């Protein structure tokens, strides 16, 4: 077992920053656990908000953009905390990034970030999920649906099954899953549609400066933009050639 710990104190000047914490994952690692804890959680009537984004040696591995002052992430070959992708843990440099969405003026925020890596037999990785067949209603007309929804993969309490059941109960024709800054639930939601309910994926770009939806894809979209840049316009322009909606 390998353990590593980071800790620091932040002030309001550190609000709206991406703080990378780099660590090495050795070959043969079967499970990783990343724990973020911080205090104080509340300042007056407002909460501080620190979230996690994880990158493995190949790129984006998941994110947990949700409330609370304790975030525990487990990633293994066969399972992962919602918001993160299961699968092999490639050897090399990983990054646990703390996204400081809100740090209130006044009392500083102290955080600790603990990394625990365990060796062992590699669990089988879930097979890619095929997309469900499209809805039988494909002609022009009026359709009832929802372009914006969340699950336990970000900051909602409902599972994907519960979301889809609610959509059917309300008589929707289609629904898009758009969790905050992660795509970990998209394969599942797309596979669970049927002829009566079209299910599709997307992502809500929950930036420090505003929110936007990218609909129709499975790939993660880098939401880390700088104020005053044209990054959002570039994301929109890059979406259209891939038949995505922005």
Set out the residue ranges of the language-model regions.
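Edge beta-strands of jelly-roll/beta-sandwich modules across compartments, strongly enriched
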Residues: 46, 104-117
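Surface-exposed loop/turn motifs at beta-strand-loop junctions within extracellular Ig-like
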Residues: 100-102, 117, 203
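A metal-dependent hydrolase metal-coordination microenvironment
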Residues: 131, 135-246
């Amino acid at each position: 077992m390998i353990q590593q710990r980071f800790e620091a104190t932040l002030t309001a000047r550190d609000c709206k920053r991406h703080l990378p914490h780099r660590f090495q994952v050795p070959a043969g690692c079967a499970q990783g656990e990343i724990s973020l804890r911080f205090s104080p959680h509340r300042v007056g009537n407002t909460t501080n908000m620190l979230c996690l984004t994880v990158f493995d040696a190949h790129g984006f591995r998941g994110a947990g953009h949700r409330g609370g002052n304790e975030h525990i992430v487990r990633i293994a070959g066969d399972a992962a905390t919602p918001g993160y992708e299961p699968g092999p843990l490639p050897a090399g440099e990983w990054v646990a990034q703390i996204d400081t969405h809100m740090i209130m003026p006044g009392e500083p925020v102290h955080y600790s970030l603990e990394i625990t890596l365990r060796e062992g037999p590699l669990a089988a990785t879930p097979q890619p999920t095929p997309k469900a067949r499209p809805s039988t209603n494909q002609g022009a007309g009026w359709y009832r649906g929802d372009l914006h929804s969340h699950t336990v993969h970000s900051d909602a309490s409902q599972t994907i099954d519960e979301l889809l059941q609610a959509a059917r109960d309300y008589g929707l024709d289609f629904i898009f899953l758009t969790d905050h800054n992660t795509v970990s639930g998209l394969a599942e939601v797309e596979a669970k549609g049927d002829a009566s309910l079209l299910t599709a994926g997307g992502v809500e770009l929950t930036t420090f400066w505003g929110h936007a939806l990218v609909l129709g894809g499975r790939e993660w979209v880098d939401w880390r933009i700088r104020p005053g840049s044209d990054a959002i316009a570039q994301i929109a322009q890059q979406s259209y050639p891939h038949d995505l909606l922005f």
